[in-house]
Amino acid sequence: MGRRYFGTDGIRGKVGDAPITPDFVLRLGYAAGKVLASAPGRAASGARPTVLIGKDTRVSGYMLEAALEAGFSAAGVDVMLAGPMPTPGVAYLTRALRLSAGVVISASHNPYHDNGIKFFSADGNKLPDEIEAEIEAWLDKPLDCAASDGLGKARRLDDAAGRYIEFCKSTFPAAFDLRGMKLVVDCAHGAAYQVAPHVFHELGADVIPIGVAPNGFNINDGVGATAPDALMRAVRANHADLGIALDGDADRLLVVDHTGRLYNGDELLYVLVKDRIATNGQVEGAVGTLMTNFAVEVALKEAGVQFVRAAVGDRYVLEQLRERGWQLGAEGSGHILSLDRHSTGDGIVSALLVLAALKRSGKTLAQMLEGVTLFPQKLINVRMKPGADWKGSEAIRRAIDSAEQALSGSGRVLIRASGTEPVLRVMVEARQATDANRHAEAIADAVKQATA
């Protein structure tokens, strides 16, 4: 059964345009509620399902929360409201409170005018494709509201923030604290604005918070992981030891060192793997994506660590980790997974893992990454006619083969079609930027000529 609305990270779009409308979200809540109520063992036990709803700081979150709550209530499902809460916080609380499911109202790193809905199962994992398909099937059925005595009830979870703060702190080694460290924490005017500064402060750090004044319209606007320049300036201006950049729903992390240098998810993955090797003796493998920088793959293999590339998207990184029984994976954008700490990517927990690695090693980030220099990447988006057969073009194949032969193990070529528009993405990595640029442009020219 296919899916019409769910993508790789829930349902997302511009508020007011289908499907991110109040009427659709109400029906979505009802449909999800009916699926939860019919889950194996649920009907037999007679227990009423309970879901947790969290959101980020977008002005539309209040409207969509009310619609979602109404839909669940109509399906006979109880609701707990967490208020503004990072996506990984909802995943944790759903699992810790033994709830039926968790729901996050957020569009993550997107601008304020977008929003979305994503679900977590009772164990804090994203819903399987087949459950999302079941929910979509219920969207086509009439909304048959429960009788008055069967309506779901709603209440606020008053201690949600405190519970999540304590969970985050519990992932940091008891032998360490952050006393003597000055940290700039950028919360992107998003879901972590109330919790992230407290986590680091309660562990002893001198915290300088930025991006903690949400007004409903400024989430991710010039701050956070998608706009790290503000953090880089703040770290230098305040002579801080480290800067921590989260995105709107706090499932991503980028880090800035004391010099103002930015470190992405690829580099942080390498740091965490090296820390695990130092503490545990070995790491069997790690997972990146098709976009992970080639230099990180080379460095991990030199350290004796297997490296696997998943499709782009933390959902696919998670799938590969589970399939292999590994713990560490990441995307360059800052989604970092450490499955022995959390079931999903968590920007705050990932920052604590990095800080623990620095404490254990006594090194700076630059020192831990010594010898690992990211390869320059050249990305060219080539527009094509819809349906153009670029895979069957001999000219494109020759251009790709020529680049791969020239790079000969010192770089790589990645060609992939966009899933949302008629664009072919041509990416080349090489040790020298001039080589990456030259080969990418040659392939892009071949694509343009072959698909004109």
UniProtKB/Swiss-Prot annotation:
Keywords: Isomerase, Magnesium, Metal-binding, Phosphoprotein. InterPro entries: A-D-PHexomutase_a/b/a-I, A-D-PHexomutase_a/b/a-I/II/III, A-D-PHexomutase_a/b/a-II, A-D-PHexomutase_a/b/a-III, A-D-PHexomutase_C, A-D-PHexomutase_C_sf, A-D-PHexomutase_CS, Alpha-D-phosphohexomutase_SF. GO terms for biological process: carbohydrate metabolic process; peptidoglycan biosynthetic process; UDP-N-acetylglucosamine biosynthetic process. Activated by phosphorylation. Its cofactor is Mg(2+). The modification Phosphoserine is found at residue 108. Pfam families: PGM_PMM_I, PGM_PMM_II, PGM_PMM_III, PGM_PMM_IV. Its EC number is 5.4.2.10. The keyword tRNA-binding does not apply. GO terms for molecular function: magnesium ion binding; phosphoglucosamine mutase activity; phosphomannomutase activity. It catalyses: alpha-D-glucosamine 1-phosphate = D-glucosamine 6-phosphate. The keyword Metal-binding applies. Gene3D superfamilies: Alpha-D-Glucose-1,6-Bisphosphate, subunit A, domain 3 (3.40.120.10), Alpha-D-phosphohexomutase, C-terminal domain (3.30.310.50). Binds 1 Mg(2+) ion per subunit. The active site is at 108 (phosphoserine intermediate). Mg(2+) binds at residues 108, 247, 249, 251. It comes from the Bacteria. One of its GO terms (cellular component) is cytosol. It is an enzyme of class 5 (isomerase). Belongs to the phosphohexose mutase family. PANTHER family: PHOSPHOGLUCOMUTASE (ALPHA-D-GLUCOSE-1,6-BISPHOSPHATE-DEPENDENT) (PTHR42946:SF1), PHOSPHOHEXOSE MUTASE (PTHR42946). Catalyzes the conversion of glucosamine-6-phosphate to glucosamine-1-phosphate. This is Phosphoglucosamine mutase. It comes from Burkholderia mallei (strain ATCC 23344). The lineage of its organism: Bacteria, Pseudomonadati, Pseudomonadota, Betaproteobacteria, Burkholderiales.
